[in-house]
Swiss-Prot record:
This is Large ribosomal subunit protein uL11. InterPro entries: Ribosomal_uL11, Ribosomal_uL11_bac-typ, Ribosomal_uL11_C, Ribosomal_uL11_C_sf, Ribosomal_uL11_CS, Ribosomal_uL11_N, Ribosomal_uL11_N_sf. Belongs to the universal ribosomal protein uL11 family. One of its GO terms (molecular function) is large ribosomal subunit rRNA binding. PANTHER family: 60S RIBOSOMAL PROTEIN L12, LARGE RIBOSOMAL SUBUNIT PROTEIN UL11M. The lineage of its organism: Bacteria, Bacillati, Actinomycetota, Actinomycetes, Pseudonocardiales. One of its GO terms (biological process) is translation. Signal peptide: none annotated. PROSITE patterns: RIBOSOMAL_L11. GO terms for cellular component: cytosolic large ribosomal subunit.
């Protein structure tokens, strides 16, 4: 007889710096209210994201009724990747008036390649257009 499927109790979505998960907010309260072992998650997440230190890595945590959990790592947010590519700290407060930096089409294509698994696009050109739109709405000029 096949093993019984665990019943899903909740799905928690968080954005945590890679390799730096700890029981302090936002991780602790989000997991604590579902009865998950917080330290166990922190150790597993930090081990899984050790190679991506410095980036913010979104994670989707599936919590089951027996309080066990499973998590899926996503790719870093497009906005963070664009800021890093442009070499600026943050986007513009007035994106369509004040431009804060420039990104080339090659950089956008590279980011689109990275984000392809999480994006709702069929090919690289469509993914590039999505990323270029994000760049424009952050006050970055797209060249090329």
């Amino acid at each position: 007889m096949p093993p019984k499927k665990k019943k899903l109790a909740a799905i928690i979505k968080l954005q945590i710096s890679a390799g730096q998960a700890n029981p302090a907010p936002p991780v602790g309260p989000a997991l604590g209210q579902h009865g998950v072992n917080i330290m166990e998650f922190c150790k597993a997440y930090n081990a899984a994201t050790e190679s991506q230190r410095g980036d913010v890595v979104p994670v989707e945590i599936s919590v089951f009724e027996d309080r066990s959990f499973d998590f899926k790592l996503k790719t870093p947010p497009a906005a963070k990747l664009l800021l890093k590519a442009a070499g600026v700290q943050k986007g513009s407060g007035e994106p369509h008036k004040t431009k804060v930096g420039k990104v080339s089409m090659d950089q956008i294509r590279e980011i689109a390649q990275t984000k392809m698994v999480d994006l709702n696009a069929n090919d690289l050109d469509q993914a590039s257009k999505i990323i270029a739109g994000t760049a424009r709405s952050m006050g970055l000029t797209v060249e090329g």
